Amino acid sequence: MKYKLFPLILCITLFSCQLQKKGNASTPIKEVDICIYGGTSAGVIAAYSAKKMGKSVLLVEPGKYLGGMTTGGLGATDIGNKYAVTGLARLFYRRIGEHYNKFEQWTFPPSVATATMNRFVKDADLDVLYYRRITDAQVQNKRIESITLEDSRQPDEETLIQVKAKQFIDCSYEGDLMAKAGVSYFVGREGNEEQDETLNGVQMSFWHQFPDGVDPYLKEGDPNSGLCWGIQPNTLKERGSGDKLVQAYNFRLCLTDNKENQRPFEKPENYDPAKYELLARAIRKMDLHID
């Protein structure tokens, strides 16, 4: 049975009530005012804020890193007008600036972002559980009473922990806590017709496109040779239509033209240059040069 809850932007806050017993009697139990699931930037800042307000807080992270995309390589911030950034977000960028002896800094490598995020954790003396992944949520009367966590490195009953809290906040990217709690969700992108909107579903972007004239065929100019790796022969769907697809995942890396900071690239095992042929052709078409 699913329970519908009203979502808030970025995360959903679910209030708990009296504990309902779950799991065996030997399962360790942690009890706090606020449990935050997901050590993303939102999760760290939510935990920091709650702790500074005098609440007992537990921050749960399924992996071993805090900060999400901010510390994972997304070092160029899409801010538009920087004066729109206030509060603790602004404090984060100003602390990044301290590293460079500047007032504020909007671009940064993962190492500096990680150190800055860990500073928030240290300043608030946050209790962080790493490698803990949700397996179940105990819900009564549409309220979360407790959640059960397993060790993501060794998922078995011997590693289970139960967390009781007055308030739960899902700050994960995937929304696993919400899903376990029975909140309805949609995988993919909704079409415009779902909510009578205009910017959902398939969109014909004018930005971030390949330059005109990049040949798609394995042998340039020869359709019979097949398509380059990564190109799908599917027909583009109608503008505004929905689907069940999700965004691709990728790894980010930092490059520099500072010789002192450069490190050599090592050729990975099973490297296949054919997977990057489209990139090479796009670079040539844009007349870019890499020294």
Which residues does each predicted region cover?
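Conserved N-terminal/central alpha/beta ligand/cofactor-binding core
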Residues: S49, K55-S56, E61-Q140, F186, ...
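Conserved beta-strand-loop-beta-strand element in the redox core of flavoprotein oxidoreductases
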Residues: Q138-Q162
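Residues that flank catalytic or metal-binding motifs in active/ligand-binding sites
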Residues: Y130, R143, L245-Y249
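N-terminal Rossmann-fold NAD(P) dinucleotide-binding loop
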Residues: G43
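Bacterial Sec-dependent N-terminal signal peptides
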Residues: M1-I29
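Flavin (FAD/FMN)-binding glycine-rich loop and adjacent Rossmann-like elements that form
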Residues: A25, P155-Q167, C171-D291
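Beta1/beta-strand and adjacent pyrophosphate-binding region of the FAD-binding site
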Residues: T27-T40
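Glycine-rich, N-terminal phosphate-binding loop of Rossmann-like dinucleotide-binding domains
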Residues: G39, D151, S172
